[in-house]
Regions:
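Active-site nucleotide-donor binding segment shared across nucleotidyl transfer reactions
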Residues: 17-70
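Short, flexible/disordered secondary-structure transition segments
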Residues: 8-11, 78-82, 132-135
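Short amphipathic alpha-helical segments embedded in low-complexity Lys/Glu-rich regions
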Residues: 1, 13-19, 85
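Plant-skewed but cross-kingdom recognition/interaction modules and surfaces
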Residues: 28, 33-36, 43-51, 79, ...
Length: 243
């Protein structure tokens, strides 16, 4: 309970830091399906570990304009990009609009082409940032690694600057599954919980879900769509067998 309270407090501090009205923001998230992801979600899971420079909000292309209007009402204006600074930061293809307020606080609004945010998040550079905050609570897809400050880099072509950023925040960023905590070399490939070739589901027992105080909503009642993914389908396990 104490850890959960710390997470709620961290979220409140982030919302206050970016001068947003949480009640209104949560309502917008409810109606549009928008979520907060990136470093902000990790900062809620790891309270007090680092200071945020910006906030990432993800939403489907269909509801993009609604969130733009909300940010405008909160004092944020769209910035005209001078360079393509987002090229290696976000999954492709996505549309990104950077917003700033008068005090220079920065919010990136990312329009997803995917049907569900999980399909975008599982394309992130590493598992430690595969988390999000929805109107119903906080979701961490790989808590067995993330909560132990370890991230598996999904691809060798990941942006090194992004990887170094999380190393600087105290995360062990590894490139092979054998470096992960409690990795079992003799596991059944594609079936074991720790195998990167295993199919995961949003509703499976490995996903960490932290509800908000009211508990009116939860991941099981609010996420009706069956959402699954495979982290590294092309990976060759060291001791593959049919199980």
């Amino acid at each position: 309970m104490e850890k959960r309270t710390e997470m709620h407090k961290a979220l409140a501090q982030i919302v206050d830091r970016f001068k947003l009205d949480w009640r209104v923001l949560r309502g917008v998230m409810l109606t549009t399906g928008a979520v907060i992801s990136g470093s902000a979600a990790l900062a809620v899971l790891q309270p007090g570990e680092f200071v945020l420079q910006d906030l990432d909000i993800y939403v489907t292309s269909k509801n993009f304009a609604t969130v733009v209007v909300f940010l405008k009402e909160q004092g944020y204006n769209v910035q005209i990009p001078t360079t393509d600074v987002h090229t290696s930061t976000y999954p492709k293809p996505n549309v990104i609009l950077t917003h700033k307020n008068q005090t220079g606080d920065k919010i990136d609004l990312i329009a997803m082409t995917e049907r569900h945010v999980v399909h975008a998040i599982t394309q992130f550079h590493s598992t430690c940032v595969m988390n999000y905050i929805a109107y119903y609570g906080i979701v961490c897809l790989y808590p067995q690694w993330t909560m132990h400050k370890t991230g598996l880099v999904r691809t060798e072509w990941a942006d090194q600057q992004a990887i170094n950023k999380y190393r600087g925040r105290g995360f062990a960023m590894v490139y092979t599954p054998v470096e992960l905590p409690k990795y079992e070399r003799t596991h059944a490939c594609g079936m074991h919980w720790g195998c990167v070739k295993a199919r995961r589901e949003l509703h499976d027992d490995l996903t960490l879900f932290v509800p908000f105080e009211d508990e009116e909503f939860n991941i099981h009642t609010e996420e009706r769509m069956r959402v699954g993914w495979v982290l590294q389908n092309e990976h060759k396990c060291s001791l593959e067998h049919s199980g």
